[in-house]
């Protein structure tokens, strides 16, 4: 029998004057420019952050490919992926152990905000009762390119994986010749 659960995640659009407040106990990851031109544009403020993130990804992937680390011989998948396609941007984020209720996706101005968290505590019986606790937390902010339909973002959580789809708009560039005096 198929599971027909509604796995879609609510997406909220928040404008500048309507921002909430939150207390966070861990440093926030800086925005990552997912524009295909961000890494090529030497004046892009996100260029250095993208280089840092790429370097971190390479280091992480290199440590995962040492002999004996990957016992099964299969590929190790990155915990997230972004595909910039012709008509949409598709994203995948691994969020193991989280349910739909644990995840919040919103758009704040030109930023896609993905938050999630889950706490669990388990008591073990006996005279010396110990409990085990687990906590997982996600807080990611991505700068969206100008050609996105920010009010049509869709998110779905399936088997611990968050899928986000952002439709693109057709941006027509207007060129105005300026006469030099």
From Swiss-Prot:
Q: Biological process (GO) annotations?
A: response to heat
Q: Which InterPro entries match?
A: A-crystallin/Hsp20_dom, HSP20-like_chaperone, HSP21-like
Q: Which UniProt keywords apply?
A: Chloroplast, Plastid, Stress response
Cellular localisation: Plastid, Chloroplast
Q: Which SUPFAM superfamilies match?
A: HSP20-like chaperones
Q: Where is the sHSP domain?
A: 71-181
Q: Where is the composition biased (Basic and acidic residues)?
A: 1-16
Record's Gene Ontology CC terms? chloroplast
Q: Where is this region: Disordered?
A: 1-30
The family classification in the record reads: Belongs to the small heat shock protein (HSP20) family.
PANTHER family linked: 26.5 KDA HEAT SHOCK PROTEIN, MITOCHONDRIAL, HEAT SHOCK PROTEIN 21, CHLOROPLASTIC
What is this protein's record name? Small heat shock protein, chloroplastic
State the organism named in the record: Glycine max
């Amino acid at each position: 029998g198929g599971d027909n659960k509604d796995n879609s995640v609510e997406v909220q659009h928040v404008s500048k004057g309507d921002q909430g407040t939150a207390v966070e106990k861990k440093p926030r990851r800086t925005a990552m420019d997912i524009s295909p031109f961000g890494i090529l544009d030497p004046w892009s403020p996100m260029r250095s952050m993208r280089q840092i993130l790429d370097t971190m990804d390479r280091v992480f992937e290199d440590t995962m490919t040492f002999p004996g680390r990957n016992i099964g011989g299969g590929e190790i998948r990155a915990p997230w992926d972004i595909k910039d396609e012709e008509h949409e941007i598709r994203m995948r984020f691994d969020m193991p152990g989280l349910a739909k209720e644990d995840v919040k996706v919103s758009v704040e101005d030109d930023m896609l905000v993905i938050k999630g968290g889950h706490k669990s505590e388990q008591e073990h019986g006996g005279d010396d009762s110990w409990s085990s606790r687990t906590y997982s937390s996600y807080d990611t902010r991505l700068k969206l390119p100008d050609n996105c339909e920010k009010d049509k973002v869709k998110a779905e959580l399936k088997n611990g994986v968050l899928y986000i789809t952002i439709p693109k708009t057709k941006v027509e560039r207007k060129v105005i010749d300026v006469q030099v005096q």
